[in-house]
Structures are given as C-alpha cells and as structure tokens.
Amino acid sequence: PASPKIFHGRETELEHLVDNLLSDPARVAILGPGGIGKTTLVVTALHSTRVVEKYPTRYFIPCDSVQTINSLVATIASHLSLEGSKSSMRHIIHHLTMQPLTLLILDNFETPWEPADGRVKIEEFLALLTDIRHVALLITMRGAERPSKVQWTHPFLHPLSPLSPDAAHQTFIEIADEIHDALEVGQLLEITDNIPLAVQLVANIAASEGCQATLERWKVETTALLSAGNDKQSNLEISIKLSLSSPRMASIPPAVDLLGLLSLLSDGISETDLLQSKPAIPEIAGCKTTLLCTSLAFIDHAGRLKVLAPIRDYVQTTIPPSPHLVRPLRKYFNDL
C-alpha cells in the first residue's frame, strides 16, 4: 500500500515502532480499537527509510477475510506467490527460510485469531514463523491482547489511543481546509473523540457541506452520518459492528448490557461505583474484561471505565440499555 499522505500525532509511536523493527529479531503487535489508525501507522513504518534499508523483502498481507488456519495459510502462500502443491505451511516456512531479511506484516490479525476453537493452531503457526530469526513479524489487531506463544519485542507499544486535540485539528484542516469557524470545528471534533477514522470521515463531509450543515446532520443521523462507505476503512458503523460481533463478545452476552450502561456515562464510571450500584448484569467482572480486551472500553488516567464518544452514540442509537438495567444505576447516583 502507498504511504499515507495525512499523518499527524503518531510521531512517538512511529519512532517506537521503527526502533522495534530494527531490533533482532523483531516481533511487534500494534493494538487498539477499530478506526484508531493501526494500519496507517504500520504502512507509514513500512515506508520508513530505515525499515526499507534493513528489509529488502517486505510483505503486507490483509487478514480481514481470513477465518481459519487453512485460509490464513492459503492467504500468506498467495502473497508469497506459492501456488498449488507449494501452498502448504511447510512450503511457506521453507520459502521464508531461504529469503533474505524479510518483514512480514499481517494486518487485521484479530479475524483469524479471535475464534477460540482455532486459536491454538493460529498461535502455533505464528510460533513457527517466529522461529525464522531473519523474518520480522508485525501484526495489527483490534483489542488489547497479544497472541501467546510469541516472544514479542520489548518494550511493547501500548494500545493506540485517540489523537491529541492538536493532531486531530491538523488532520481535520488538512482535509477540510482552514476556512471554517473554529468553534464549529471544535464541536465536530468533540463528536469524533479524536478517533482518526471519525476525524477523517467528518472532515470529508465538512469539506463539501460545511461545518454547520454537518453539525445539523449529526443531530439527526449520529453515527450513520459517518457510515457512507462499504468497508471499515470508510464506514464507522461497520467498524464498530465488527468489534461488537467478535467471538469474544459473543461468548459473554451480558457484556453488551454493560456496554449499554457505559454508553450513558460520558465521564465513565469508577470500579467502586460500578460494583456498588449493583447493576443486574451477571459476570460483571468478566464483562468488563471482555470490553477492555476488545477495546470497546478503556480505563482512563483516573482509573475510570469509559467508552469513546462514537461508540457511545452508536450503542445508544442501536442497542440502548433496557430500563431495568438503568434503574439501579440511576438510583445509586441519585442517592449519593
């Protein structure tokens, strides 16, 4: 893929990633919620002069349509130009062993890794790939958890966070120009919570319709306004739905109930308040862990459990919490 033309606010992460890729052997995982800019960061690093100089052979392999170990092997083999009888796991390992220094990027690796019934085989295959010392492995994954059986390069990159306000503003004006009212731009960026995908989508609309019209549309359409595209790179709702429909979320259905409650709390909730409010949600600790592992929620600097604004808006619109779940929480806060 081509190098991103708009890239603001990830300079520290980029330097950290490139430094990790220059170590031997490099095994790096980029984590974070959907739309946070994982792929953009990786592609920018892929075009870094230092990375290009070190790795004469570089493969970028999308895994978002890969569901099983067999399809993962077939997809990697195809990108390595191994066909027919030479498209097996054994042939992939042999081929990479004979290559010079190689960078192997597996993008959206959560798709094959998430299903619990196939995870062991997926991780065993990753371990085989990392046995080849001159092959650097770089994966991107939704969530906050790295696959096991791989000795990931230290120091780890933290899961990506939203952009800083300045970086989000720079991104916006680079797409929509500087002709807009500063107050209206600020209101639009507040909607996005500085998630890169949301900033990009709202800036594209503002560029053609203006900030005021975009704000008026948001009041009516909410996240549907940012969902005109047909894939998760251009459609915020598709990106959120992918996280909501992950196997991990499906394994603990009450996690959606907790997400619904959190969608009502723009400032999040402390661990103490969450437990003392006694919401009618079974396995609440497991639900919290699930939301954190899928990056549908996060812990802020004050230790509060929170959900990013675009996800809150989507959940309130499409799967709002039922009154019997909200009632204990409302009573608890009213009694404080």
Task: Give the residues covered by each predicted segment.
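Post-nucleotide-binding-loop coupling segment downstream of the phosphate-binding loop, primarily
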Residues: 3-8, 12-22, 26-105, 109-115, ...
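Alpha-helical sensor/transducer elements of the RecA-like P-loop NTPase core
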Residues: 10-12, 40-44, 70-75, 103, ...
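Short amphipathic alpha-helical segments and helix-helix/interface helices
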Residues: 14, 93-94, 107, 122-130, ...
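Phosphate/oxyanion-binding loops and surfaces in catalytic or ligand/nucleic-acid-binding neighborhoods
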Residues: 24, 36, 49, 79-83, ...
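C-terminal boundary/linker of central alpha/beta nucleotide-binding cores
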Residues: 42-43, 185, 192, 203-207, ...
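Hydrophobic residues at beta-strand termini and immediately following loops
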Residues: 61, 158-160, 333
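Structural motif corresponding to alpha-helix initiation and N-cap regions
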Residues: 85-90, 119-123, 182, 281-285
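Loop-to-helix "switch" segment enriched in basic
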Residues: 198-252, 330
